[in-house]
Amino acid sequence: MTKYFHFLDVATGEYFSVADESLNNAKAIAHENFADPVFCGILDEEEVDILGEDVY
């Protein structure tokens, strides 16, 4: 089941989400795309839509 892992890129102050089944995979994707991502929690699809964040 796909989850939305919520991150903050400390370097830019940008919040974003990674859609994946595994936190480890999500962290790897976050580190590939951002300089200093910090995991903040898990969101559901509705919360991601409301926030309007980029999803990777």
Which residues make up each language-model segment?
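Short aromatic-glycine-(Arg/Gly/Cys) micro-motifs in beta-strand/loop hairpins
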Residues: 1-14
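Short, mixed-charge low-complexity intrinsically disordered segments
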Residues: 31-56
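Short, solvent-exposed loop/hinge segments that bridge or flank secondary-structure elements
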Residues: 16-18
